[in-house]
UniProtKB/Swiss-Prot annotation:
Modification N-acetylglycine, positions: G2
Pfam families from the UniProt entry: Globin
Protein name as catalogued: Globin-1
Domain Globin: 12-158
Domain of life: Eukaryota
Entry keywords, A to Z: Acetylation, Heme, Iron, Metal-binding, Oxygen transport, Transport
Protein family per UniProt: Belongs to the globin family.
Length: 158
């Protein structure tokens, strides 16, 4: 059932939208560690309890997080995983990749509310980082792409 949902959702994302997402993601990956670190700092600002899901980073200030090796390593892992998902947006393998992420998140008690917050913060971070390149087409493309990812994660959520 989850695979069917994902495959149907793939059809909703046009080739042009996939190109926009991939192009802007490649722009962001020039500074991947700082982009993803700032993304998590934004998440922790909205939901300080979310920071406690990372015991090695619990209680750190934003400036401490920016220089933390643990945060930098996590940022690299997240950027690599996101890069993989973005490259596989039109692939039937995407649901399997996301199933692994959903299982990991379930173990760490990360669920639908966290996915919603991530979506909100991702859009804010994209706008801040891309500036004028974050136009309506870019916004719509990212929103649709993340909704595909989120739909699969929710289906796979324990």
């Amino acid at each position: 059932m989850g695979g069917t949902l994902a495959i149907q959702s793939h059809g909703d994302l046009t080739l042009a939208q996939k190109k926009i997402v991939r192009k802007t993601w490649h722009q962001l990956m020039r500074n991947k560690t700082s982009f993803v670190t700032d993304l998590f700092i934004r998440i922790f600002a909205y939901d300080p309890a979310a920071q406690n899901k990372f015991p090695q980073m619990a209680g750190m200030s934003a400036s401490q997080l920016r220089s933390s090796r643990q945060m930098q390593a996590h940022a690299i892992r997240v950027s690599s995983i996101m890069s993989e998902y973005i490259e596989e947006l039109d692939s039937d393998i995407l649901p399997e990749l996301l199933a692994t992420l959903a299982r990991t998140h379930d173990l760490n008690k990360v669920g639908p509310a966290h996915y919603d917050l991530f979506a909100k913060v991702l859009m804010e971070a994209l706008q801040a980082e891309l500036g004028s390149d974050f136009n309506q087409k870019t916004r719509d493309s990212w929103a649709k792409a993340f909704s595909i990812v989120q739909a699969v994660l929710l289906v796979k959520h324990g």
